[in-house]
Amino acid sequence: MKTAILLFTALLLSTSNFAIDNTQHLSAGETSVKEKHASAFSAHSANLKEVKSILKFNGGNKFFEDPWAQSVGSVSSQDGLGPLFNNNACQDCHVRDGRGHASEASVDQRGTDFSTMLLRASKSNITTAEKEAMLNGEQANVADSCIGGQLQHQANFGITKEATQAVSYQYHKVSFADGEKITLRTPIWHVKAIHCDIDDDTVLSARVAPAMIGLGLLALIDEQQIINQEDINDENSDGISGKANKVWSVKTKQVTLGRFGWKAGQPTLRQQSAGAFLGDMGLTTALFQQENCLTQQIECKKAANGNGDMANDYPYEVADKVLDKVTFYSNHLAVPERRNAYTKQVTNGQKIFNEIGCQQCHSASYTTTTSKAFPELSKQTIYPYTDMLLHDMGEALTDFDKNSQTVSGDIPVEFLAQANEWRTPPLWGIGLAQTVDPQATFLHDGRARNILEAVLWHGGEAELSKNKVLQLPKRQRIELLAFLEDL
């Protein structure tokens, strides 16, 4: 209790001159919307006014929401699903454009609900040349020989799916300094491939679908501003050593900054969307032209596809004009305004957030650059609370092997990103996550059932800040959560 009182006193003294920005309720500047209901994440940017642009947004929404069918479907513009896939519609992973959720405990290998999450796979026993290509940003990873780079747990009629998967949980309690306890859960994954055996050196990574809001604004944060926040060797000795991921641009054929995905493995929203079309739904695009069938998956390789033809200007299952609309839609999904930004409880919580060091990774504010393609998103002052960098989040949040055992944290798994590293996720909208989808969970694998659990899973570079939270008195914990829930 003495420690908690000392911390409380220190916070009062150090934050007495804390200044509140009177525009921060507009989390996404002029693009912010006032929505705070179940569809709060589905509105377009508030300043998107041109009828042509709104129609394009609505067109992208249609392709984002509507299910794709197995070839040959009744709607030729939306067939080609699979042969292997995780889901048949973008919206089914990104529920109402929000985040997904972890599966509840499964009683058998059939699993329960894996509709909004997936497992990525990469080998750790690779050649020197392959590792150099990853660390140079020229190659994402080396895929597992049995299930490839992503486990697809569903398949079209007549096709054998790749694997069965299930999850169970182990529970443990964490105590605050005042004696209050909270229960955390650790996922135990049960994965069994059907065609063959998953490689012994394969690293698996569970990924829940993230929220779609504000992505176009994140794309317009100046690259140098992100790079300037790097401190790879922790030269200032503050315990924080963020680094940018360097990834391959399929369009430009060059290495560039990674911005999107749990490990910042994609450079642009267009490439991110095309990657999801292929990996999650088995749909080819001009960027990713080959079906995700491995050599031994004979049924998959022989299956009919939904590719168009050159005469109709779309030789792939997702035409360029469709990818254009989905990308435009993804760029303009708006961030809701904050609801209580200037109340005493929330501003106190914001002071605590800064004092305990959360802002060292969750950088509050940026001004976006100018874009001719996206004028509404240009020159906006935004408050996403992310540095867009990779950070070591500790052993507990490190990726795992096929037996659900944590692997060595320094194994590269996605370009420069290691098994223990995750991009700092933007916090805007987090307080409405369970309004949009009551089942929504938190962190990359959804193990956290609420925001406080997510905070208490922080380790690695965030261990010190997490320990400060454990020392906070009850009232200050409530204030901290009030701030986070207002974002």
Describe every region a protein language model picked out.
Residues 18-487:
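Periplasmic c-type cytochrome electron-transfer domains
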Residues 2-7:
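Sec-dependent signal peptide recognition
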Residues 14-16:
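N-terminal signal peptide c-region/cleavage motif recognized by signal peptidases
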